[in-house]
Each structure stands twice: as C-alpha cells, then as structure tokens.
C-alpha cells in the first residue's frame, strides 16, 4: 500500500517501553492496595475468585520481561548502532547515554525487587519490606528515563506535552498521588504494610 511504512525496531522499542511503564504503574498501585489489606471479596466489587496477590506477582514478572525486551529490540535495528554491551552498560551507548543509563538502572532495580520478593522468606518479613521500598526508586528512575529519553534516539530535547511524555507524566503523578494517600491512610489507621501478602509476594 502506497504511503504505508512498517514500524522500525526503534518505533517498536518505544511502544514496548510505554507498555512497561503502564505495567509497572499498575503493579505499584495494586501493591499499595494490598498493603492496606484490600480484598475484592470483602470490598468493592465483591467478586470471588480474584487472586490479587497472584495477579500482583505476575504483573511484576511480565513488567520485568517487557522492560528487558524494550532495549533488546534495538539490537535488531540497522540504524540504532546498539550492541549487547550498550544495552547492559549504556553509559557508552551511541546515543543519549545518560537517559539510557537511567533506564538500565531502573531495570536492575526492578530485577532486584522481583528477585528479593521471590525469596522474601529467606530475608524475613521486616528486612524484605525495607528492600521492597526499592520499587519506589525504580519507578522514579524509570519515569525520569521515559520523560527524558528521545524515543527516536535523535537526542532531541524532551517535549513535555507530547502524547508519549504526557502518558509517562500521568503514570508518575498516579504513583505519587497513590503513595501520598497510602502513607496518609497509614498515619490515620496506624497500618503500615499490614496487608496480607502471598508467600512469594512481589
């Protein structure tokens, strides 16, 4: 078809990155609900058979996999010029090394959260809870990466009202607002992290 161009590897990588941001946002929001003991059977929508803990865990695994695929796709691009080392340690990547490094740091932080959560019984509840706060750092760094990085890898300055950037900004604001609500709720009820967690909760 005339005028139709297939998306490039760079285009696909950008979309996958946005999907990862959405998954991590949903995962953190769900985690905040679980931390206050939310149960869809006892509370709205009062639906049985919904296992939020399992869903929370799988969101983390899927999000981590999506975040891995996001830069890995660039290895197939004939124009991006990325190699495996540029993905793993992007401080020397061919374009926008600082935003890319932030993205890599966010990925490693998420991986740390997922792995330590899977083996949380080995750490003990109190120590694991402290380690789990790394998720907030991961979210912050990931959002900064998403807002700062040029999705076309052309080192353009960020356009904060661009649709993609606005999407990341909204996700960041949702996380901030939900976190403020969570700690405000905790102060009112003296309930910090007492929600029931699954054996391998993430």
Task: Give the role of each language-model region.
Residues 1-202:
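Membrane-embedded alpha-helical bundles that constitute the cytochrome b-like, heme-associated redox core
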């Amino acid at each position: 078809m005339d005028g139709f161009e297939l998306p490039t590897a760079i285009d696909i990588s950008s979309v996958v990155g946005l999907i990862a941001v959405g998954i991590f946002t949903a995962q953190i929001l769900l985690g905040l609900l679980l931390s206050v003991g939310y149960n869809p059977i006892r509370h709205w929508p009062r639906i049985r058979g919904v296992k939020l803990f399992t869903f929370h865990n799988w969101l983390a695994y899927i999000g981590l996999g999506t975040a891995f695929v996001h830069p890995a796709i660039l290895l197939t691009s004939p124009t991006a010029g990325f190699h495996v080392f540029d993905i793993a340690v992007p401080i020397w990547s061919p374009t926008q090394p600082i935003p890319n490094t932030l993205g890599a740091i966010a990925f490693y932080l998420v991986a740390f959260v997922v792995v330590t959560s899977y083996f949380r019984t080995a750490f003990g509840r109190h120590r694991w809870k402290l380690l789990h706060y790394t998720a907030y750092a991961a979210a912050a760094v990931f959002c900064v990466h998403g807002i700062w990085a040029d999705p076309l890898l052309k080192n353009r300055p960020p356009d904060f009202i661009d649709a993609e950037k606005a999407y990341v900004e909204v996700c960041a604001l949702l996380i901030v607002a939900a976190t403020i609500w969570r700690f405000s709720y905790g102060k009112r009820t003296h309930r910090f992290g007492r929600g029931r967690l699954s054996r391998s909760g993430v």
